[in-house]
Amino acid sequence: MSEDWVRDINGMHRYYGVNEKVQDFDADKLKQFLRFRMTFLDEELTETKNAVNANDAEEIVDGLIDLCVVAIGTLDSMGIDSYEAWNRVLRANLQKQVGVKPERPNPLDLPDLIKPAGWKAPSHANNHGLLTKLKK
């Protein structure tokens, strides 16, 4: 256990043999795996929303962490470099500016990040891992 979630999840996957199994999937099985993981995320999000509605602090924390575990675990099992993906997204997000996005109400008056003119979305080129097995 550490403060490096990506490394911890990778270690857990190695311990249980998850990545070795997923690496052998053909495109159809890989697509099935991705659908399974997206359903898993939906279930965790629903549980977390229910915890918020119930003011259940314990389950809110657990649910938020579970969402991170499933999302990071999916990247890991797909052979995607999560550190690189994170850095690319963070770099792009830090180019955004505080402003007002009219189509997104902000009743809490928190700083809202908007894309300035010329903003470029992050590219994950060369970091698609096993997703390259899928055809568009």
Residue ranges and their predicted role:
Residues 1-64, 68-136:
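Flexible "arm" and connector segments at domain edges
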